[in-house]
């Protein structure tokens, strides 16, 4: 169960960069339903981080990706109106590149869009997602 968990849930995220663009998905499910974010999701029991990332990206974007280095590890803790922990994820974000396919909306996303780096503010990303994306561009450029 993801809502009101007994322990943190491990998740993965993909920063997929193409030139000066990054791939974003509009989330189809909570938390952050209908918000723009990086493709990714929860790791299943018995699944490696990298395998989970490849699966989640394919489910959300129909792309096959090659998983690169870790960009950042962060936690996302959401509390309800009574200050109870409603969500707690530990997320490992990776820099990825497209191996094959065309980005289209998969089963776990409302929309998929290549966003210009200079235009990220219009997607109203979380502070953490914006930081991870900028760090990924810096890693790619170094």
Regions found by a protein language model. Give the residues of each.
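Conserved N-terminal beta-strand and adjoining loop/helix that marks the start
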Residues: 1-22, 95
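The catalytic Nudix box helix
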Residues: 38-71, 94
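A conserved beta-turn-beta hairpin within the catalytic core of GNAT-like acetyltransferases
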Residues: 31-34
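NUDIX/MutT-family hydrolases
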Residues: 93-95, 104-136
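Active-site-adjacent beta-strand/loop module that shapes the phosphate/pyrophosphate-binding cleft
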Residues: 74-102
């Amino acid at each position: 169960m993801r809502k009101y968990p007994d322990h943190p849930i491990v998740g993965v995220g993909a920063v997929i960069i193409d030139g000066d663009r990054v791939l974003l998905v509009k989330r189809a499910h909570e938390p952050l339903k209908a918000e723009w974010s990086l493709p990714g999701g929860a790791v299943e029991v018995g699944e490696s981080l990298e395998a989970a990332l490849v699966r989640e990206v394919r489910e959300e974007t129909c792309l096959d990706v090659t998983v690169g280095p870790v960009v950042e590890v962060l936690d996302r803790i959401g509390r309800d109106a009574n200050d109870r922990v409603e969500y707690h994820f530990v997320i490992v974000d990776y820099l990825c590149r497209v191996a094959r396919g065309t980005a289209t909306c998969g089963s776990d996303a409302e929309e998929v869009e290549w966003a210009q780096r200079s235009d990220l503010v219009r997607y109203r990303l979380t502070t953490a997602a914006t930081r991870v994306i900028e760090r990924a561009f810096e890693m790619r450029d170094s």
